[in-house]
């Protein structure tokens, strides 16, 4: 039985309309990310052994995020107690995913054991993306957390797994780890907006939240490209439009 509730697409549509002030920039920016070189790399992936380096970085991300979610839960102030089931369910749903990934990597001889993954040097871009979530957990701003992690990062994650899951099946290496994230991340993305206020896009608070969501998307894009040896740092304006893509 799935941990995640069946997606209510009518509710999703209502939230997209109600919060178009932030949904539109998120969608526009995340769509741009899908046009970047990393997705060409996935499309051209013909041997799962070529996924090893990316897989080891992904393991760190997959292993760390539930801990960040646990921190968000643990630091929840009394006045935010009603959010605890939401945070707890998200953390619990992600808790065993890194083990699933490790088992898959060992099964397909990408690594021989856990220590081999531990010995990998994590890219600064991967650390930056994870630390973005840690910073929000410490800050305990519910709206920033929901637009940044649940709506921005999770949407990009959903796009990633929608691309990589069928590719792995095509290569004869499909696995529940990849498949479950298509369901899980789609469940989390945008639905969290049910717990934030409605703002005008040009209001001070609206601009702060849009900027926080786009910051996460920028960090995500830099992170996944670092997994394949590309240094790129996209920058979006508050409409979600690309204004700069620095490649080093």
Question: What are the functions of these language-model segments?
Answer:
Residues 2-248:
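Non-heme di-metal
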């Amino acid at each position: 039985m799935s941990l995640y509730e069946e997606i209510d697409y009518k509710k999703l549509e209502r939230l997209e309309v109600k919060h178009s002030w932030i949904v539109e920039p998120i969608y526009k920016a995340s769509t741009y990310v899908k046009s970047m070189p990393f997705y060409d790399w996935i499309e051209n992936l013909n041997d799962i052994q070529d996924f090893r380096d990316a897989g080891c970085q992904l393991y760190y991300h997959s292993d760390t995020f539930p801990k960040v979610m646990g921190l968000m839960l643990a630091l929840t102030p009394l006045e935010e107690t009603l959010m605890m089931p939401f945070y707890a369910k998200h953390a619990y749903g992600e808790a065993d995913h890194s083990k699933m990934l490790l088992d898959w990597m060992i099964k397909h001889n990408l690594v021989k054991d856990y220590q081999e993954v531990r010995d990998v040097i994590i890219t600064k871009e991967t650390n930056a993306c994870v630390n973005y979530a840690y910073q929000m957990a410490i800050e305990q701003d519910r709206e920033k957390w929901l637009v940044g992690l649940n709506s921005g990062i999770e949407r990009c994650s959903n796009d990633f797994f929608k691309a990589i899951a069928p590719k792995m099946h095509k290569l004869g290496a499909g696995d529940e780890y990849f498949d479950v994230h298509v369901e899980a991340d789609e469940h989390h993305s945008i639905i969290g907006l049910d717990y934030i206020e409605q703002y005008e896009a040009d209001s001070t608070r609206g601009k702060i939240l849009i900027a926080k969501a786009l910051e996460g998307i920028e960090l995500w894009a830099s992170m996944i490209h670092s997994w394949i040896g590309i240094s790129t740092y996209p920058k979006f304006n508050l409409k979600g439009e690309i204004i700069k893509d620095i490649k080093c």
